[in-house]
Amino acid sequence: EKMHIRPLTDLIHKRGGVIMLIKIEAIVREEKFEQVKSALQDIQVNGVTISQVMGYGTQRGYTEIVRGSEVDILLHPKIKFEVVVSSEEWEQKTISAIQKAAFTGEVGDGKIFSYEIRSAVKIRTKETGYNAVQSQDNL
């Protein structure tokens, strides 16, 4: 299923005349996958990478009975969403959409991180920076 492609040229963040890219990583509960994916589609993000990951934070591990024995499970299955945007406005809009969609109020809801990207290269076309992440076609 393709995400809707939306030009980002109306909302861009520049530093020294160069468009700055911001990467947002969100690690959320597996059961929130569809809600977060839909929230990102609703705000028309330009693209997203989604991965299944394992980890723990304040939630820590838990004990489970496996074949009659107690086993400590240290890592929890999670879903990681990665989105690249080109403005602080889009950064806040994206974080807000993810936070709202992923929220349960319980320990283990996840984390959202954002940081500036130093460089980006589209392998197929050799485009760099903003042009590397701005889709001009559906290929």
Segments predicted by a language model, with ranges:
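Positively charged, small/polar-rich N-terminal and surface patches that mediate targeting and assembly
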Residues: 4-139
